[in-house]
């Protein structure tokens, strides 16, 4: 996690401080999960301030600037609105409103004394910091910056490669076939995704965010076979390339993304939630050699 001394403006080029905040309405926004798009963080102060309403109207005058996969907008308030209904109505996958009622997020971006808009690149580094008192006009300057941004895939000027390790032949073919046959015979259940509420992590099924069926492997002998091949064939590669000694496995599952029902998993990080912060590496091993599904994408890269 990055930090920024309270009250100091963020330095352009530096990584932005990570944060999580409740959405006005329902749900939670985690900055670290939102990577992979240009992100507009507009610190608006109190919604009771008439200028906050005017600046917001000006910023959202051209909503076509914002797109869930390209540029997203977050309006951040330091006090609750008298009526949240208008903000809920304006909310879309590309436009959201965040509750920063203790002011901690605003302070970490230097927005406590002077409201401002900060633009982040897909790797969550600051590329623009436009205060309300900008001589060229706050909203107009923000719009000019957004119109000048390249496509997400061209944000670095050169192709980027995710720090993902690909290791062939981790499982024997016999183990792959066995696990596939067990799944075909028993089937899986909706796996859902982890969701934090009131400091607790629970599982929520929402087909817009994820659709996958999982079968937990519970037989000790099978788990030991899986673990043995991973420890001998994958763990040394992780230690060699990432200088990290993996000592535990979180769970043993056979997962299926079925194209017939639109299997998918929306953007996420595996260790954001309270109940998953022990995770360090996600391991996916393809079991079937006729797999021709979608790609695994790392939005930041």
PLM features per residue range, with description:
Residues 1-32, 54, 58:
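N-terminal "domain-start" segment that seeds a small globular fold
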Residues 19, 106, 114-132:
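A short, hydrophobic beta-strand/beta-hairpin element that forms part of a small beta-sheet core
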Residues 29-60:
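Short active-site neighborhood of thiol/selenol oxidoreductases, capturing the structured segment around
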Residues 32-34, 111, 132:
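Residue-level structural signal for beta-strand termini and adjacent loop
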Residues 37, 53-75, 88-89:
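Conserved helix-turn-beta segment immediately C-terminal to the redox Cys motif
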Residues 74, 88-114:
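Short, internal strand/loop/helix patches
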Residues 80-86:
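Short, charged/polar "capping" segments at the starts of alpha-helices
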Residues 122, 140-301:
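Fe(II)/2-oxoglutarate oxygenase catalytic core
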